[in-house]
Regions:
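Short helix-boundary/capping micro-motifs
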Residues: 12-28
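A short LG(V/I)-centered, amphipathic sequence patch enriched
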Residues: 40-57, 62
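Hydrophobic residues on short alpha-helical segments
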Residues: 6-13, 58, 65
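Interdomain hinge and pocket-entrance segments immediately C-terminal to HTH DNA-binding domains
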Residues: 83-92
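The N-cap/first-turn positions of alpha helices
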Residues: 2-8, 29, 61
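Residue cluster at the C-terminal edge of the helix-turn-helix DNA-binding motif
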Residues: 15, 24, 37-46
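Short, solvent-exposed amphipathic helices
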Residues: 60-77, 85
């Protein structure tokens, strides 16, 4: 699992635009496309329906949305929890 791919998925779902997601994430549009493609390949389903400049979540993308939000929340908590004891030890 690539946490950056999950975050990219959430940003594309939010903005409904690969270019806008790229700008928000400070990466290139090709990086966004590659991350989404990789995620789709690992899951085995298309996550977005792409129609003439319009992007929307596919049924699989909608199903992934809740899990993706949970994953990023847990990841942030883990980072905070792991970083906190280290910071406390350094200040002693």
């Amino acid at each position: 699992m690539d946490i950056n791919a999950i975050k990219t998925f959430l940003e594309v779902a939010k903005t409904r635009h690969f270019g806008h997601a790229a700008n928000a994430l400070f990466v290139s549009q090709s990086t966004v496309s590659a991350r989404i493609r990789s995620l789709e390949e690992s899951i085995g389903a298309e996550l977005f329906i792409r129609e003439r400049g319009n992007i929307r979540l596919s049924p699989s993308g909608e199903a992934l949305m809740t899990y993706a939000q949970g994953i990023t929340t847990l990841w942030a908590r883990a980072q905070q929890e792991i970083a906190s004891p280290q910071g406390a030890r350094e200040t002693i």
